[in-house]
Each structure stands twice: as structure tokens, then as C-alpha cells.
Design a protein with these regions (language model features):
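Active-site-proximal catalytic alpha-helix in oxidoreductases
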Residues: 221
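Catalytic cores of RNA-modifying enzymes
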Residues: 1-217, 242-245, 256, 265-277
């Protein structure tokens, strides 16, 4: 079966990746090895699925919402011993493979209208991370989102999302993906990124994560203001000054200038202050 008669549906945010070089880069970035079990989100017409099945991976489990595409995927790949398919919304259906065990890695062409919720589902939140984490996620996302995820302190794109994602895993750029690489072409630039989630022992504890979230919400709500002003409610000025210095933070800085580890250090100091009170 071919998909030539199936047109992209706007309500599903469908833009099919057709550039072979980018498809190859995605598979290369996943670094698939013998035994790897892969979750593919949004297989579409199967261009990436075909490459994943040809890789060393042991199993490819695809999740597709569009019923018409499900029929074509099942006809094209249903007899392949490494392939399984689940029809449904990736935000709500179980993501485990047929044996009930989770995948090792994720490859996803994320519809731009569900990027935030899907990141929560695949990686989790700072205070509620996915556990156990996937070994690696290779994600095709809107360029602006990719910039915010991997931005470094001091950059205009550095945000609360940057801090959260970089405390949950190692985020890196794979390749740019211009609109011409899709059918139909989207109106925005895209990018492939790679995220290697940290194991639990390298992530902030639940208590620290809650403290960091509290600080991020306060600080980035008024990102143009200095921390001396935005963080004033957390404790007395003298205590805030002392804790900031211990964390390597200047209260004259703005939130986008503070590194993720420094936010953790400040949250730790505040937690200790609260415990001693």
C-alpha cells in the first residue's frame, strides 16, 4: 500500500519528513545497537520507520493517531518481526511495548501543537521526572523550541524551560531542518535535537526540584527584573544575599544569566534555611 492518496491533515499537525539525509541523521543520532527497543512517535507514512527497522534495533513500537495511516503502516510493516503498532493519542495511550516493558529510546517527529505536553509525557517535569528515564530521545521540534531547550545562560533564549530540561538531561543539537524537507512544508524552521536523560542519582531530589520550580516561577515571571527584586519574597534581604553568594549568584543578575546548577544550589540553601527555622 502507498500513501499517495492520503493528504496531510491540519488538525493532526501533519508534516511528513521526506528529506533522506535528515532521516538518516535521525537514525544515526539514535545510535541504535543490538537489543535496543525503540518508541517511534508519529510514524506518518513510514519513511523513518523503514530506516529504523533496517537498523540494529531489536524492536520498533510506533504510535499513530491517524486511522488511515495506521492501516497503511500495518499493511506495509505489519509482518515485520520487529514492528508493532498502537493506534491512538500518544498523550494518553500506554507507551510500553507489547510485552508491557518500556522502550529504551524514543524517536519522534513531534506535532508542534503538542510539543509541551509530549515532552512532559516522555521526559517528565523537574519534580516528577519519567522514571526510569529513556536512554535517549531524538526529537524533531520547532526551531524556537529547540533553541529554548538547549540555550546557555546569558543567551536571550535561555528560559525556565532551558533550566528544567538541562537539569533532566544532556541536550544537544543534531541538525537544522528547513521547511523544504517536509511535505507539506510548514511555515516555521525545525531542528532535530538529542536528549540523554540523567539517571535518578544525577537529578535534583524531589525536595530540591520543588524548590527550583518555586524559584523559576518567581524569577522568570518578570525576566527583565533583577533577582534582588523578583526573589525578595523568599526570605530576608540578608539571608537572600548570603545564600545567593554561596550559590555563585549575583542578585544584580537577571534569571536568564543564572546556570541550572546555580538554581539548584540556591534552592538547597533555601531548603536548609527553612528547615532550621
Amino acid at each position: 500500500m502507498t500513501f499517495s492518496g492520503h493528504t496531510a491533515r491540519k488538525r493532526f499537525g501533519q508534516h511528513w519528513l521526506i528529506n533522506e539525509r535528515v532521516l538518516d541523521r535521525i537514525v544515526e543520532a539514535a545510535e541504535l545497537k543490538n537489543g535496543d527497543r525503540v518508541l517511534e512517535v508519529g510514524p506518518g507514512r513510514g519513511a523513518l520507520t523503514d530506516r529504523l527497522l533496517a537498523s540494529a534495533a531489536a524492536a520498533i513500537h510506533a504510535v499513530e493517531l491517524d486511522r488511515d495511516l495506521v492501516a497503511g503502516l500495518q499493511q506495509n510493516f505489519g509482518r515485520h518481526p520487529k514492528f508493532s503498532l498502537r493506534e491512538g493519542d500518544v498523550l494518553s495511550v500506554p507507551l510500553e511495548l507489547a510485552d508491557g516493558e518500556p522502550a529504551d529510546k524514543v524517536v519522534a517527529n513531534i506535532p508542534y501543537n503538542i510539543t509541551g505536553p509530549l515532552l512532559d509525557r516522555l521526559i517528565g517535569r523537574l519534580d516528577r521526572p519519567v522514571d526510569p528515564p529513556y536512554q535517549r530521545l531524538v526529537l524533531l521540534v520547532q526551531h524556537e523550541v529547540a533553541q529554548r531547550i538547549r540555550a546557555r545562560p546569558g543567551h536571550s533564549n535561555f528560559s525556565a524551560l532551558s533550566v528544567r530540561m538541562q537539569l533532566l538531561g544532556r541536550c544537544s543539537h543534531v541538525c537544522p531542518v528547513p521547511p523544504r524537507c517536509f511535505q507539506p512544508p510548514p511555515k516555521v524552521q525545525s531542528e532535530v535535537i538529542c536528549i540523554d536523560p540523567f539517571p535518578p542519582e544525577l537529578r535534583p531530589s524531589a525536595a530540591l526540584a520543588r524548590g527550583v520550580e518555586r524559584l523559576l516561577k518567581m524569577a522568570f515571571l518578570s525576566r527583565r527584573k533583577m533577582l534582588r527584586n523578583t526573589l525578595a519574597p523568599v526570605c530576608s534581604p540578608d539571608h537572600l544575599q548570603s545564600l545567593a553568594e554561596e550559590a555563585g549568584i549575583s542578585l544584580q543578575q537577571r534569571p536568564q544569566d543564572v546556570a541550572p546548577d546555580a538554581w539548584v544550589a540556591l534552592a538547597k540553601g533555601l531548603n536548609q534555611l527553612d528547615s532550621a527555622a
